[in-house]
Amino acid sequence: MNRLTLEEFKEAEKLPLIVVLDDVRSLYNVGSVFRSCDAFRVEAVYLCGITATPPNAEIHKTALGGEDSVDWDYFKTTEEAVEKLKQKGYFVYSIEQVEGSTKLQNLPEAHEELFKQEKESEKQGNESEKQESSSLPKGYAVIFGNEVKGVKQNIVDMSDGCLEIPQFGTKHSLNVSVTAGIVVWEFTKLLKL
């Protein structure tokens, strides 16, 4: 296996994706998300509200050191995190089952639509206008909500869009860390490190 050292990981190119945890209460879920983010070299994890932060033995138990390799930041509120992401030029998705959400399997088409809009913008303007009005994001951010309440409605409203994982059984929810692993993998395929 080609495992990176911690130093090599810190220097390696990252997937332009930031994972945001919105009031995730389980320390084991937080650790598991860090572990998945390490596996796919995610740019950073933003921990918000009641979400616990490293160093923490329970987070470490499931993260297996992922909390040391993946950059992270803490925000008192998820609103602050979303505002920062938008200022930095990220396209923000809430992962939530809401009317009008994009099915995760349709993410490539949604991504392609951003590029299509950018190409149309290029045809209509000069170089300086392109830079000012670029519709291409610097990267993506995905927000995962509380295990019981999901992503708060005001955060959904602040987001650029919503993604959901279609489900076909008797339950209409997945564990937040499982959901994060699935979504991060889809972005890994889309953005190709």
PLM segments and residue spans:
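Short Gly/Pro-enriched loop/turn and capping motifs at secondary-structure junctions
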Residues: 98-100, 147-150, 168-170
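Intrinsically disordered, low-complexity terminal tails and inter-domain linkers enriched
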Residues: 105-138
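Structured adenosyl-cofactor binding patch, chiefly the S-adenosyl-L-methionine
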Residues: 153-193
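Glycine-rich, phosphate-binding/catalytic loops in enzymes
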Residues: 36-38, 110-111, 158-161
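RNA substrate-binding interface of SAM-dependent RNA methyltransferases
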Residues: 2-100, 188
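Short, glycine/polar-rich helix-capping loops at beta-to-alpha or helix-loop-helix junctions
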Residues: 54-59, 149-155
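A structural motif corresponding to the C-terminal end of an alpha-helix
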Residues: 81, 85-88, 151-161
